[in-house]
């Protein structure tokens, strides 16, 4: 595993971390029990099986 040779300053660490941005989750339209809902793709299968309450979305 790579280890740093020199200590990184707190200012450099904070400025690097501040550049990180989270992306919005892409939503997919799904029809469940005659109701069209927009939910994240990873929850589609669980929603169709009834494991997730789609009323939250």
Swiss-Prot record:
Please provide the Gene Ontology terms (biological process) for this protein.
translation
Q: Which UniProt keywords apply?
A: Ribonucleoprotein, Ribosomal protein
Pfam families for this protein:
Ribosomal_L32p
Does the keyword Lipid biosynthesis feature in the UniProt annotation? Answer: no
**GO function term, MF aspect, one:** structural constituent of ribosome
Question: InterPro entries from the xrefs?
Answer: Ribosomal_bL32, Ribosomal_zn-bd
Can you cite an annotated GO cellular component?
large ribosomal subunit
Signal sequence: where? none
Asked if the record carries the keyword Ribosomal protein, the reply is yes
| Residue ranges of the region described as Disordered | 1-20
Ranges of compositional bias, category Basic residues: 1-19
On the tree of life, the source organism's domain of life is: Bacteria
Q: Supply the NCBIfam families for this chain.
A: rpmF_bact
State the family named in the UniProt similarity comment for this chain.
Belongs to the bacterial ribosomal protein bL32 family.
Name listed for the protein in its UniProt record: Large ribosomal subunit protein bL32
Q: Which organism is it from?
A: Corynebacterium aurimucosum (strain ATCC 700975 / DSM 44827 / CIP 107346 / CN-1)
């Amino acid at each position: 595993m790579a280890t740093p040779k020199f200590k990184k300053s707190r200012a450099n660490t904070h400025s690097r971390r501040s550049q990180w941005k989270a992306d919005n989750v892409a939503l997919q339209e799904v029809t469940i029990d005659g109701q069209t809902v927009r939910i994240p793709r990873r929850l589609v299968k669980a929603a169709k099986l009834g494991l997730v309450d789609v009323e939250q979305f």
